[in-house]
């Protein structure tokens, strides 16, 4: 990490990780003492506690980096957001798609009840992953034999969730890269499937499970399409922490859950059809550098995230001053060494967070030959998933 970047990132890291540990501690106490007595009371409290941490990342996007998120949606869809449970299905275009979702959830008043289906390793990320675990995010191993029951039970637990929630599901299964697109195109060409140009072939098992298990209490599916204008550099966590702006376009279309077909095969085909339509929509975006013919909705950046960050900064600064005055930490070599160690740990944690978000570090998808597939085989790749559904 370059010295100039470190000079900016480390202070932000100190604020984020120390406040995050406080939040994690509060979440743990509530989990142990309150959740056994009342799960919904725990959820209501955790929603407020978790939001005080997640708003710091919203502040980084909105105020520190000045990322501009432009939302395109019809009035009916936009007015429903935040007032109902929803399954959110999105293409995985950038390194911060999950943060874009948080921004939209925050604008809609449901940031504290935003959920997602994520890979299991994410829950071990310092502070942020722990807060997600306490908030009932669903973590999968990318092995359907193990994940099927985990996903089903996790989805069914949301039946009595006390506030409107969004559950995000990235059905492509991995972030978009040119290498993965090429693999998907080669597979589609050999399997007589529509050849994608801007998206990957969706994995439909998780989507089918989500629809089957939640259609009785989740009324809507928000189909989100993320695109980066040609005039804007792609947003990354490193760019955010360095205060470098970007522009992100998001198109949102609401589908009523009751309008989806009943059978699993038809639900899977519906999902694939939506990604074919999403691919065509992205073609139009590439040509026009916007979503043509779509209404742009106003989502001004709110003051709440700024107020939270200022409050955390004041509290931690005051606490640090009192601690240093009491401990005389810098009056000995041991104290200086401990301080240096703490800074080193925070720097390492920031690097882990940044590196975990980088799409190019993901393993490129492998092209599987078109052949019949054992129904009991794991659906861990988009190509083999399509094979099973196309039998």
UniProtKB/Swiss-Prot annotation:
InterPro entries registered for this protein in UniProt: Acyltransf_C, Plipid/glycerol_acylTrfase
Chain segments annotated as transmembrane: 3-23, 306-326, 334-354
Subcellular location per the Swiss-Prot or TrEMBL entry: Endoplasmic reticulum membrane
GO cellular component, one term: endoplasmic reticulum membrane
Region Disordered, annotated ranges: 358-391
Keyword Endoplasmic reticulum belongs to the record: yes
EC number: 2.3.1.51
Protein name: 1-acyl-sn-glycerol-3-phosphate acyltransferase 2
């Amino acid at each position: 990490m370059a010295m100039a970047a470190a000079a900016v990132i480390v202070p932000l890291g100190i604020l984020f990780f120390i406040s995050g540990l406080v939040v994690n501690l509060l979440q743990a106490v509530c989990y142990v003492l309150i959740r056994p007595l009342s799960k919904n009371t725990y959820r209501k409290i955790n929603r407020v506690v978790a939001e005080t941490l997640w708003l710091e990342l919203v502040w980084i996007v909105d105020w520190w980096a000045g990322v501009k998120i432009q939302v395109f949606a019809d009035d009916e869809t936009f007015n429903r957001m935040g007032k109902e449970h929803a399954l959110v299905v999105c293409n995985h275009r950038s390194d911060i798609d999950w943060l874009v979702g948080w921004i939209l959830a925050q604008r809609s008043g449901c940031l504290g009840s935003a959920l997602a289906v994520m890979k299991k390793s994410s829950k071990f990320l310092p502070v942020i992953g722990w807060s997600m675990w306490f908030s009932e995010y669903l973590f999968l191993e990318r092995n359907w034999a193990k994940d099927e029951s985990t996903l089903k039970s996790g989805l069914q637990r949301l039946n009595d969730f006390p506030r409107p929630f969004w559950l995000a599901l990235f059905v492509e299964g991995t972030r978009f890269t040119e290498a993965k697109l090429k693999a998907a195109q080669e597979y589609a060409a050999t399997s007589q499937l529509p050849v994608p140009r801007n998206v990957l072939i969706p994995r439909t098992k998780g989507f089918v499970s989500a629809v089957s298990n939640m259609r009785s209490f989740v009324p809507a599916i928000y189909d989100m399409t993320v695109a980066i204008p040609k005039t804007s550099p792609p947003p990354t966590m490193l760019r955010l922490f360095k205060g470098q702006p970007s522009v992100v376009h998001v198109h949102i279309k609401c589908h009523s859950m009751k309008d989806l077909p009943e059978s699993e095969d038809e639900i899977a085909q519906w999902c694939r059809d939506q990604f074919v339509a999403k691919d065509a929509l992205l073609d139009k975006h590439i040509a026009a550098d916007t979503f043509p013919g779509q209404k742009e909705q106003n989502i001004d950046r709110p003051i709440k995230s700024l107020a939270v960050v200022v409050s955390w900064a004041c509290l931690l600064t005051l606490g640090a001053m009192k601690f240093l005055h009491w401990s005389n930490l810098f009056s000995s070599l041991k104290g200086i060494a401990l301080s240096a160690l703490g800074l080193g740990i925070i720097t390492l944690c920031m690097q882990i967070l940044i590196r975990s978000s980088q799409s190019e570090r993901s393993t490129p998808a492998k092209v599987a030959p078109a052949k019949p597939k054992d129904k009991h085989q794991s659906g861990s790749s988009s190509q083999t998933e399509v094979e099973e559904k196309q039998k």
